[in-house]
From Swiss-Prot:
The keyword Zinc-finger does not apply. InterPro entries: Ribosomal_bS16, Ribosomal_bS16_CS, Ribosomal_bS16_dom_sf. The lineage of its organism: Bacteria, Pseudomonadati, Campylobacterota, Epsilonproteobacteria, Campylobacterales. GO terms for cellular component: cytoplasm; small ribosomal subunit. It comes from Campylobacter hominis (strain ATCC BAA-381 / DSM 21671 / CCUG 45161 / LMG 19568 / NCTC 13146 / CH001A). The gene is rpsP. One of its GO terms (molecular function) is structural constituent of ribosome. Keywords: Ribonucleoprotein, Ribosomal protein. It comes from the Bacteria. The keyword Ribonucleoprotein applies. GO terms for biological process: translation. This is Small ribosomal subunit protein bS16. It holds the Pfam family Ribosomal_S16. Belongs to the bacterial ribosomal protein bS16 family.
Length: 75
């Protein structure tokens, strides 16, 4: 099973809100996931919370990080 850390969209139409999740790469964007490690709200200034220890753990065990997650967590 290839795991990936990516965003899943929640929230209303025209008002996005994202969870940072670990999931199987073959699953759809918003389908089942293994673990939620944080959230990101692009409409608010500096609204990003995630567990850096869990992100490091998943990277260590081989999970790939999506480009968008890598960009927002590197800030």
């Amino acid at each position: 099973m290839a795991t990936v850390v990516r965003l899943t969209r929640i929230g209303r139409k025209k008002s996005p809100f994202y969870r940072i999740v670990v999931t199987d790469s073959r699953k759809r964007r918003d389908s089942g996931f293994i673990e939620t490690i944080g959230y990101y709200n692009p409409r608010m200034e500096e609204e990003l919370k995630f567990d850096a220890d869990r992100l490091a753990y998943w990277k260590k065990v081989g999970a790939k990080v999506s480009d968008r997650v890598a960009k927002i967590t590197s800030k």
